[in-house]
Swiss-Prot record:
Organism, scientific name: Nostoc sp. (strain PCC 7120 / SAG 25.82 / UTEX 2576)
EC code(s) of this entry: 4.3.3.7
Described purpose of this protein according to its UniProt entry: Catalyzes the condensation of (S)-aspartate-beta-semialdehyde [(S)-ASA] and pyruvate to 4-hydroxy-tetrahydrodipicolinate (HTPA).
A single Gene Ontology CC term: cytosol
The keyword Lyase is assigned to this record: yes
Localization terms from the record: Cytoplasm
Subunit structure: Homotetramer; dimer of dimers.
Family indicated by similarity: Belongs to the DapA family.
Any single GO BP term: lysine biosynthetic process via diaminopimelate
Site location (Part of a proton relay during catalysis): 46, 109
Protein name as annotated: 4-hydroxy-tetrahydrodipicolinate synthase
Active site: 136 (proton donor/acceptor), 164 (schiff-base intermediate with substrate)
């Protein structure tokens, strides 16, 4: 259940000048990503600005992207919430239109204890038992870490198939890998940690950089998996400045600016996020030119 491949793109959400969702550009971008190294599209996650999207906008994006990539790639719906009831309702609605999985972030702001986190994810999984669920641990944003012990317990639930581990803690990821079944999938939540996490048993990455270098990420992962570690390391080190530059300010501000530099009409970020300033744009332009991305 839930084979999502190795390169999952955390897709941005394009907006029009009036601030409404640009579904046409979303479809065009989705098709381009699938043609350039993306196995699965993660729609309405952090990079997709889910905190400032309405549930209706999210649902419409799921429909648009599903129709665009039908038969070519999988779609994971970001339906997370710090309300268990809302997360269940959104996930059930997404499941009915045929998404291939759901990404569920650790509930933010209200900081539930580990018992509450377990009950939250268990309830969502049980409400949609046929839908693969990917946990999403990003304590820097949520204020609460999903402990390895809780992940291990959750991995016993049939349709909880993996975790996007964005704590930045390699020891934590290692503990999860050590204590969970081999079929439980670990995905890097930071592009710069993809190769280190592959070395301790991760399957791939939920990537921001794959908007720009999806094929190169595929090459890096394939090289590592075939024993060509030096080749994989060379690709990682070549791309590392890009990985770092895409996070010099709050994601998705830099990646949206990078796409604009390539000519994509992705629009602004929604408030309270702000657009990239001149310094960020100049740094992006320099690293992208060095990699022949513009």
């Amino acid at each position: 259940m839930g084979d999502f491949g190795t390169v999952l793109t955390a897709m941005i959400t394009p907006f029009k000048a009036d601030g409404s969702v640009n579904y046409a550009v979303a479809a065009e971008l989705a098709a381009n990503l699938v043609d350039n190294g993306t196995d699965t599209l993660v729609v309405c996650g952090t990079t997709g600005e889910s905190p400032t999207l309405s549930w209706d906008e999210e649902y419409n994006l799921f429909v648009e992207v599903l129709q665009t990539v039908a038969g070519k790639a999988k779609v994971i719906a970001g339906c997370g919430s710090n309300s268990t009831k809302e997360a269940i309702a959104a996930t059930q609605k997404a499941a009915k239109i045929g998404v291939h999985g759901t990404l569920q972030v650790v509930p933010y702001y209200n900081k539930p204890p580990q018992a509450g986190l377990y009950q939250h994810f268990q309830a969502i999984a049980q409400a949609c038992p046929e839908l693969p669920l990917l946990l999403y641990n990003v304590p820097g944003r949520t204020g609460q870490n999903l402990s390895p012990e809780t992940v291990v317990r959750l991995a016993e639930i049939d349709n909880i198939v993996g975790v996007k581990e964005a704590s930045g803690n390699l020891d934590q990821a290692g503990e999860i890998r050590r204590l969970t079944p081999k079929e439980f999938q670990i995905y890097a939540g930071d592009d710069s940690l993809t190769l280190p996490l592959l070395a301790i048993g991760a399957k791939g990455v939920v990537s921001v950089a794959s908007h720009l270098v999806g094929n190169q990420l595929q090459q890096m992962i394939q090289a590592f998996n075939s024993g060509q570690v030096t080749v994989a390391s060379d690709i990682h080190l070549r791309l590392l400045p890009l990985f770092k530059t895409l996070f010099i300010t709050t994601n998705p501000i830099p990646i949206k600016q990078a796409l604009k530099l390539q000519g994509w009409e992705v629009g602004s970020t929604r408030p309270p996020l702000s657009d990239a300033d001149a310094e960020v744009s100049q740094k992006l332009e320099a690293v992208m030119k060095h990699l022949d991305l513009i």
